[in-house]
């Protein structure tokens, strides 16, 4: 079912979720939620994203609100803790929000910080969690990444380096130089050809996110063409977007790694009761936002109008596609 623009706007709720610490350069996360006939969907493309890229996120939100979820193969998903680029002294406080979690992803290569800061943070995490992976968000050159790999493994192993460099060619070059597995994120979700990183033998692990890839159906189609392990991660989603990620993870034939779906713990408040990991797992199931929370977290009128205008622009870029759950695709996906 494809909603009209008028119907979509009538079902829209725009909220601002305050964060416990600065993450990805922001302290408040704005998202638009869609109260659809099949459930709730989320449109949360980051504010700086241009309409064509953001339109994939709108497709994902429409699919969740109007489509049918895939059949699941598991009813709970192992998750990793996410540690922002905080000081080493703040690490115990962050990890305390992820009870039972045995894997942590640590942000590194933060602008304004240095490798020594990263080493201190990673070692502080290593004292409390069994398995550590790091995410540079493409912040290093090949040479800097190679040096970081040595420094970050001096006191213990890393599960993998996530997006250490920005380009597929750089990832491939680094992979030839280091023994640590390389994971690709931005090289998949922001690429015109999300499979190029696999064909180039540039990664050992694929980090896939539902919203940037255009929804669960598109996510699963891409995952089916990737012959390396998949890690499902969030895009700093609200509990609504996290739910879509859990459903996608539950539908994968294999799930070898803990997933980055615990980022809800980074928010001070969310639109529904926060999901708490139990023994390092989150349950798979639907979510319904609390009306009181929707109202309390609602944005001022000017911000709501900004999101309405954004939905209008992105919606105008979508084209019908009978093969997708949402019934829509971005123009470049045709």
Swiss-Prot record:
Entry annotation: catalytic residues: 107 (proton donor), 209 (proton acceptor)
SMART domains: MR_MLE (SM00922)
Cofactor(s) the protein requires to work: a divalent metal cation
GO molecular function, one term: magnesium ion binding
GO biological process, one term: menaquinone biosynthetic process
EC number, as in UniProt: 4.2.1.113
Domain of life assignment: Bacteria
Stated role: Converts 2-succinyl-6-hydroxy-2,4-cyclohexadiene-1-carboxylate (SHCHC) to 2-succinylbenzoate (OSB).
Protein name: o-succinylbenzoate synthase
Native source organism of the sequence: Mycobacterium leprae (strain TN)
Upper classification of the organism: Bacteria, Bacillati, Actinomycetota, Actinomycetes, Mycobacteriales
Gene, per the UniProt record: menC
């Amino acid at each position: 079912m494809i909603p009209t623009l008028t119907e979509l706007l009538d079902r829209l709720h725009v909220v601002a979720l305050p964060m416990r610490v600065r993450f990805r350069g922001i302290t408040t996360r704005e998202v638009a939620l869609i109260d659809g006939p099949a459930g709730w969907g989320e449109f949360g493309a980051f504010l700086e994203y241009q309409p064509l890229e953001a339109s994939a996120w709108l497709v994902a939100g429409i699919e969740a609100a109007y489509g049918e979820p895939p059949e699941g193969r598991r009813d709970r998903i192992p998750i990793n803790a996410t540690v922002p680029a905080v000081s080493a002294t703040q690490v115990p406080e962050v990890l305390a929000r992820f009870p039972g979690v045995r894997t942590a992803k640590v942000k590194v290569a933060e602008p304004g910080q240095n490798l020594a800061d990263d080493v201190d943070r990673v070692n502080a995490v290593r004292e409390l969690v069994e398995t550590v992976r790091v995410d540079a968000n493409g912040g290093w050159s090949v040479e800097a990444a190679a040096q970081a790999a040595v420094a970050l493994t001096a006191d213990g192993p890393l599960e993998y380096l996530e997006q250490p460099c920005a380009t597929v060619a750089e990832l491939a070059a680094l992979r030839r130089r280091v023994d640590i597995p390389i994971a690709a994120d931005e090289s998949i979700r922001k690429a015109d050809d999300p499979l190029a990183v696999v064909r180039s033998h540039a990664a050992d692990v694929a980090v896939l996110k539902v919203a940037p890839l255009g929804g669960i159906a598109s996510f699963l189609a891409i995952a089916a063409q990737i012959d390396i392990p998949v890690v499902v991660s969030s895009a700093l989603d609200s509990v609504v977007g996290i739910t879509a990620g859990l459903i996608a993870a539950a539908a994968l034939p294999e799930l070898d790694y803990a997933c980055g779906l615990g980022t809800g713990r980074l928010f001070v408040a969310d639109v529904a009761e926060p999901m708490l990991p139990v023994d390092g797992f989150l349950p798979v199931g639907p979510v319904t936002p609390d009306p009181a929370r929707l109202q309390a977290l609602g944005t001022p009128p000017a911000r709501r109008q900004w999101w309405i205008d954004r939905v209008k622009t992105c919606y105008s870029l979508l084209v019908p596609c009978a093969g997708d759950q949402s019934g829509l695709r971005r123009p470049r996906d045709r």
